[in-house]
UniProtKB/Swiss-Prot annotation:
Pfam families recorded: PMSR, SelR
UniProt xrefs under PANTHER family: PEPTIDE METHIONINE SULFOXIDE REDUCTASE, PEPTIDE METHIONINE SULFOXIDE REDUCTASE MSRA 2
A single GO BP: protein modification process
Catalytic activity: L-methionyl-[protein] + [thioredoxin]-disulfide + H2O = L-methionyl-(R)-S-oxide-[protein] + [thioredoxin]-dithiol; L-methionyl-[protein] + [thioredoxin]-disulfide + H2O = L-methionyl-(S)-S-oxide-[protein] + [thioredoxin]-dithiol; [thioredoxin]-disulfide + L-methionine + H2O = L-methionine (S)-S-oxide + [thioredoxin]-dithiol
Similarity comment: family membership: In the N-terminal section; belongs to the MsrB Met sulfoxide reductase family. In the C-terminal section; belongs to the MsrA Met sulfoxide reductase family.
Protein name, as recorded: Peptide methionine sulfoxide reductase MsrB/MsrA
């Protein structure tokens, strides 16, 4: 067995490397709907989200779509005297399962029938971080460069207005902040290290202002998803304060996570689409060692 496959159990190896199939109704995730996301058990690449999982009655985990358009590859499979469409992971080329055209019509009509043994599950509160650090274009671009981060979405959170638009949030009356939702692999990077990146990539002593952006929607904030995340943030902030790391007091707020509303599509991955766009962050810091 290759070195990067030595961590696999027998069934994980047979499924991902030899295209075996698990027994229906007797596998780990067939009836699990805990919020979170699923990674390739071989490589750790992001494959599926729990929000896209549904009960198909087939006895294997079923998803209406992959986590993003290029998360998986599909190929013709003529084994067992059948014509099917096989699903494999893009980077590790792991066999995952098959996709069929009998999924829920309201979800697009597809059913990704996936072996549990090909997946590693990360619970939402263990692999998700919500931060606000000024203009979300820059914050997104920074965290996309951090090793262990799987996906970053920009959006709005922290307020009470339902389904806000960018125009709504710009008024400063919604209570929402421009924020990022980060999915990360806790086996690669810890939440504490993400916090350290957060405090490094913006000015947490500047009240409602980052760069040229001013207003409560540009506040410095950590939106915690669990008591553990809250405690880790409080501990790190206390350590920084005690060590005099910053010349002024921290103004970062600790807020319990509320609904996160993804921003309009043109805001997503903005600085990749618009390389000359406004950025208040030194992006190179994302790849430099933490203190």
């Amino acid at each position: 067995m290759l070195a990067n496959l030595q961590h696999l159990s027998d069934i994980q190896y047979r499924v991902t490397q030899q295209s075996a199939t698990e027994t229906p109704f007797k596998n780990e995730f067939w009836n699990s709907y805990q919020p979170g996301f699923y990674l390739d058990v071989v490589s750790g690449e992001l494959l599926f989200l729990s929000e896209d999982k549904f009960d198909s009655g087939c006895g294997w985990p079923s998803f209406s779509a992959p986590a993003y358009a290029r998360a998986v590859i599909e190929k013709e499979d003529r084994t067992h005297n059948m014509l099917r469409t096989e699903v494999r992971s893009r980077n590790a080329n792991s066999h995952l399962g098959h996709v069929f055209k009998d999924g829920p019509p309201e979800r697009g009509g597809l059913r990704y029938c996936i072996n549990s043994a090909a997946l590693r599950f990360v619970a939402r509160e263990e692999g998700t971080a919500l931060f606000a650090a000024g203009c979300f274009w820059s914050t997104e671009a920074y965290f996309r460069r951090v090793k262990g981060v799987l996906r970053v979405r920009v959006g709005y959170t922290g307020g009470t207005t339902k389904s806000p638009t960018y125009r709504n949030v710009c008024t400063g009356t919604t209570g929402h902040a421009e924020a990022v939702e980060i999915l990360f692999d806790p086996q690669v990077i810890s939440y504490e290290d993400l916090l350290k990146h957060f405090f490094r990539m913006h000015d947490p002593t500047s009240l409602n202002k980052q760069g040229g952006d001013v207003g409560t929607q540009y506040r410095s904030a950590i939106f915690y998803l669990s008591g553990t995340q809250k405690q880790q943030a409080e501990t790190l902030m206390g350590r920084y304060a005690g060590a005099g790391k910053f010349t002024r007091p921290l103004v970062t707020t600790l807020e319990e996570a509320r609904d996160f509303y993804p921003a309009e599509e043109y805001h997503q991955d903005y600085l990749t689409k618009n390389p000359g766009g406004y950025c208040h962050v030194s992006l190179h810091l994302a790849s430099e060692p933490l203190e």
